[in-house]
Amino acid sequence: MERVLIVNADDFGLSKGQNYGIVEAYRNGVVTSTTALVNGEAIDHAAQLSRELPALGVGMHFVLTLGKPVSEMPGLTRDGLLGKWIWQMAEEDTLPLDEIAHELACQYQRFIDVFGREPTHLDSHHHVHMFPQIFPIVARFAAQRGIALRIDRQTVLNADDLPSDLRSTQGFSSEFYGEEITEACFLRILDASTHRGEASLEVMCHPAFVDNIIRQSAYCYPRLTELEVLTSASLKAAIAERGYRPGSFLDI
């Protein structure tokens, strides 16, 4: 059975170092797709690079934890900025869901304005779209527009909660992350998906070159390690040997 493998690089538009790392991992490695933060400092640079790479699938990385929102969000921001206090608000069930739904629509329109096309799919920074209060908003939004959505089926949900016309991969992994990033780790993810009988799999990654913005991230130098692994010729060969076809969310 042929299996579709989507290797999606998150954080396109975060910084020029991030952008160049993603492009390097696409041109000379196994990355096939990316998702862009429309409020990122280097989003225009990302859009410029993407125009030179029309086959690179570009989706939208919905942001509720970093930087300035596109719309006014007095119920979620502090001093005009988004932040990780969203976790506490989710636990207390005090999320401003109307503001979040409006911000999603505004970020989506901003993506179209910057990239000149609709995103191939949606996911989110720090996986906030998987919060039980937020997931129905994002799932409905994606289904209405006919675009795919990253779904971590281990954290949500039974299938009855999903819109019938919502597209996603059968499998998703965030395990290629952290301090122990190796080719063996990547291949274990593929082998586990094969064992589950999944016909499509998304693997999340964050390849980057380190610049001043990336240095401010709690997840900094492992991004360079990811880039090294993802551009390994032996990894590309091992993926092909396992019967995976590289693809984007347009292939599911």
Curated annotation (Swiss-Prot):
Homodimer. Involved in the degradation of chitin. ChbG is essential for growth on the acetylated chitooligosaccharides chitobiose and chitotriose but is dispensable for growth on cellobiose and chitosan dimer, the deacetylated form of chitobiose. Deacetylation of chitobiose-6-P and chitotriose-6-P is necessary for both the activation of the chb promoter by the regulatory protein ChbR and the hydrolysis of phosphorylated beta-glucosides by the phospho-beta-glucosidase ChbF. Mg(2+) binds at H61, H125. The lineage of its organism: Bacteria, Pseudomonadati, Pseudomonadota, Gammaproteobacteria, Enterobacterales. Keywords: Carbohydrate metabolism, Chitin degradation, Cytoplasm, Hydrolase, Magnesium, Metal-binding, Polysaccharide degradation. It comes from Salmonella paratyphi C (strain RKS4594). It comes from the Bacteria. It is found in: Cytoplasm. It is an enzyme of class 3 (hydrolase). This is Chitooligosaccharide deacetylase. One of its GO terms (biological process) is diacetylchitobiose catabolic process. HAMAP family: COD.
